[in-house]
Amino acid sequence: MTPCRRGEGRVADQIAPEGVYSKSGARLLDRTGERRLPVGFDGFETVAARLVFVDKSILVADVLESGQAVTLFCRPRRFGKTLAMTMLKAFFELPPDGVSRVSLFEGLEVWDACDGRYRVEQGVRPVVFFTFNEVKKADWALAYENITVAMSWF
């Protein structure tokens, strides 16, 4: 893919009726108008539909344009890794229930970037999602056992 300029297609500074607030290139979304923060939520579908969040969807474009076979996301605890991964899953995944996830991304930066060129990538790939969120144990032996059990599901 030929990269486009980051920020191309961004909404000008405004408050849009669909709950997209844009200022100086950053987007804050609150589609319900309830101003509820996503404390304790890390699933993108829930957060995007019901809570306030910062639009980091351009990560999709970054992944597509990187050309890398593998991308490692390293961040400290509580920095939104799982939210970012569930966003990527929701964007790329062939919906197992057959219900389109397009509405989650309409109005987000990735949807508008580069004249909508990333839209064709939405919902067209099989995705394997694995998280270590539930593998928190006091010692290595218990953690290893939980990892083995979680991976045996695949």
Description of each model-found segment:
Residues 17-97, 101-112:
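Walker A/P-loop-proximal flanking segment of P-loop NTPase domains
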Residues 55, 90-154:
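P-loop NTPase motor core
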Residues 7-9, 19:
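Residue-identity detector for glycine
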Residues 9-10, 119:
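Residue-level detector of alpha-helical transmembrane segments in integral membrane proteins
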